[in-house]
Amino acid sequence: MKHYPHYLDLKPAMHAKGVVRLPGSKSISNRTLLLAALAQGTTHIRDLLASDDTHVMLMALQKLGVKWEQIGESQDYIVHGVDGSFPVHQADLFMGNAGTAIRPLTAALAVTGGDYTLHGVSRMHERPIGDLVDALNAIGTHIEYTGEPGYPPLHIQRGRIHAHEMSVRGNVSSQFLTALLMAAPLMTREQDVIINVIGDLISKPYIEITLNLIQRFGVEVQRNGWQSFTIKAGQRYISPGNIHVEGDASSASYFLAAGAIAGGPVRVEGVGRDSIQGDVRFVEALEQMGATVRMGDNWIEAESNGVLRAIDADFNHIPDAAMTIAVAALYADGPSILRNIGSWRVKETDRISAMATELRKLGAIVEEGEDYLKVTPPAEILSAAIDTYDDHRMAMCFSLATLDGAARRGNKERINDPQCVAKTFPEYFEAFAKVTEESLF
């Protein structure tokens, strides 16, 4: 895996053009690993993402007694399913800062039973998990906090499930609902499971990914809009045999935005019209800003069509990819407003605060609300040292501030702690350098 120095100096780039093969989707990779582990049968996973977060999941599954093999040096894996019951009933599991690992694993371990501790880096212990724990403990699982209530670390012990209807708030993180949906088939041997959503559900496209993958592993979920989900009794996860992980649509956003800002065309391969990821709808925002976008079944291409137009839009459905729009707004013809992004506050860092702070370093005027950002672009983007807050998306987003270098020849940008991109895209800066035709150092 690529290792970067403590900082990376990026030079202004005049133009962006080229083709990028995307790494696998983080959301799909970690869901698929857990489903394959819980299934009956053996699953061949192709093009799994190589990253810190998938490594966390693989190591946790190994500690739980799940057998898996990597095929040579490829990103193809064989996972031998345990048919709903982990062989190891006592384990200490390190979760890093991987929300896509700790939340589904918490639910699966709580309903199957055992003696487990789950902990991570310091930021993980600041990310809320109380709504998920409350939903599970209400039906008889036994999950305790070993630190601050409502947050990891967690201690899971064997409980006694006495109910099969759960309720969870939908407005904090969609990963709580994902975790319950993935764990539900482990409880349906004799009785239906019903999951109710309290209030509005954010990030609905991520739930679509979950439902799609659960179905691929043989379980049907009946739904009443976004308010309730029923998993009928008698179902279990069954391996589909082979499954392919499509490219990461959130990672695609940086390259497509580069094409929209600095000429293009820039094409990403591995995700396209047939994607199950909601973040492909990022291109709708680029089109609103005036970019030209083309899509195939497994590729997307974007190019500039003049100066980007300012945008005022609701980004609740694509919170991760929306970060890219915040930086692209530096190049717009007026103030842009990103609305309904409150979930940014509980991600790898408080992304609203972090984004506002770093955009101001570049000369932007930024108004920060509880769930929105207003970005007024500067006349000229300033040189700056960008802090990344151990957040992979902050590092990748702000590489875009090096574009359109003709207008600000001589300005430079420094990315502090570039190694944080290893969470989802270890080779990101090499890929970005290829499409901007600039050396890294």
From Swiss-Prot:
<dbReference type="GO" id="GO:0005737">
    <property type="term" value="C:cytoplasm"/>
</dbReference>
<dbReference type="GO" id="GO:0009073">
    <property type="term" value="P:aromatic amino acid family biosynthetic process"/>
</dbReference>
<feature type="binding site">
    <location>
        <position position="27"/>
    </location>
    <ligand>
        <name>3-phosphoshikimate</name>
    </ligand>
</feature>
<feature type="binding site">
    <location>
        <position position="26"/>
    </location>
    <ligand>
        <name>phosphoenolpyruvate</name>
    </ligand>
</feature>
<comment type="pathway">
    <text>Metabolic intermediate biosynthesis; chorismate biosynthesis; chorismate from D-erythrose 4-phosphate and phosphoenolpyruvate: step 6/7.</text>
</comment>
<protein>
    <recommendedName>
        <fullName>3-phosphoshikimate 1-carboxyvinyltransferase</fullName>
        <ecNumber>2.5.1.19</ecNumber>
    </recommendedName>
</protein>
<feature type="binding site">
    <location>
        <position position="26"/>
    </location>
    <ligand>
        <name>3-phosphoshikimate</name>
    </ligand>
</feature>
<keyword id="KW-0808">Transferase</keyword>
<feature type="binding site">
    <location>
        <position position="393"/>
    </location>
    <ligand>
        <name>phosphoenolpyruvate</name>
    </ligand>
</feature>
<feature type="binding site">
    <location>
        <position position="351"/>
    </location>
    <ligand>
        <name>phosphoenolpyruvate</name>
    </ligand>
</feature>
<keyword id="KW-0057">Aromatic amino acid biosynthesis</keyword>
<dbReference type="GO" id="GO:0003866">
    <property type="term" value="F:3-phosphoshikimate 1-carboxyvinyltransferase activity"/>
</dbReference>
<feature type="binding site">
    <location>
        <position position="175"/>
    </location>
    <ligand>
        <name>phosphoenolpyruvate</name>
    </ligand>
</feature>
<dbReference type="GO" id="GO:0008652">
    <property type="term" value="P:amino acid biosynthetic process"/>
</dbReference>
<dbReference type="GO" id="GO:0009423">
    <property type="term" value="P:chorismate biosynthetic process"/>
</dbReference>
<comment type="similarity">
    <text>Belongs to the EPSP synthase family.</text>
</comment>
<comment type="function">
    <text>Catalyzes the transfer of the enolpyruvyl moiety of phosphoenolpyruvate (PEP) to the 5-hydroxyl of shikimate-3-phosphate (S3P) to produce enolpyruvyl shikimate-3-phosphate and inorganic phosphate.</text>
</comment>
<feature type="binding site">
    <location>
        <position position="173"/>
    </location>
    <ligand>
        <name>3-phosphoshikimate</name>
    </ligand>
</feature>
<dbReference type="InterPro" id="IPR001986">
    <property type="entry name" value="Enolpyruvate_Tfrase_dom"/>
</dbReference>
<dbReference type="InterPro" id="IPR036968">
    <property type="entry name" value="Enolpyruvate_Tfrase_sf"/>
</dbReference>
<keyword id="KW-0028">Amino-acid biosynthesis</keyword>
<feature type="binding site">
    <location>
        <position position="174"/>
    </location>
    <ligand>
        <name>3-phosphoshikimate</name>
    </ligand>
</feature>
<keyword id="KW-0963">Cytoplasm</keyword>
<feature type="binding site">
    <location>
        <position position="99"/>
    </location>
    <ligand>
        <name>phosphoenolpyruvate</name>
    </ligand>
</feature>
<dbReference type="Pfam" id="PF00275">
    <property type="entry name" value="EPSP_synthase"/>
</dbReference>
<feature type="binding site">
    <location>
        <position position="127"/>
    </location>
    <ligand>
        <name>phosphoenolpyruvate</name>
    </ligand>
</feature>
<feature type="binding site">
    <location>
        <position position="203"/>
    </location>
    <ligand>
        <name>3-phosphoshikimate</name>
    </ligand>
</feature>
<feature type="binding site">
    <location>
        <position position="31"/>
    </location>
    <ligand>
        <name>3-phosphoshikimate</name>
    </ligand>
</feature>
<feature type="binding site">
    <location>
        <position position="423"/>
    </location>
    <ligand>
        <name>phosphoenolpyruvate</name>
    </ligand>
</feature>
<feature type="active site" description="Proton acceptor">
    <location>
        <position position="320"/>
    </location>
</feature>
<dbReference type="InterPro" id="IPR023193">
    <property type="entry name" value="EPSP_synthase_CS"/>
</dbReference>
<dbReference type="InterPro" id="IPR013792">
    <property type="entry name" value="RNA3'P_cycl/enolpyr_Trfase_a/b"/>
</dbReference>
<comment type="subunit">
    <text>Monomer.</text>
</comment>
<feature type="binding site">
    <location>
        <position position="175"/>
    </location>
    <ligand>
        <name>3-phosphoshikimate</name>
    </ligand>
</feature>
<feature type="binding site">
    <location>
        <position position="320"/>
    </location>
    <ligand>
        <name>3-phosphoshikimate</name>
    </ligand>
</feature>
<feature type="binding site">
    <location>
        <position position="347"/>
    </location>
    <ligand>
        <name>3-phosphoshikimate</name>
    </ligand>
</feature>
<dbReference type="InterPro" id="IPR006264">
    <property type="entry name" value="EPSP_synthase"/>
</dbReference>
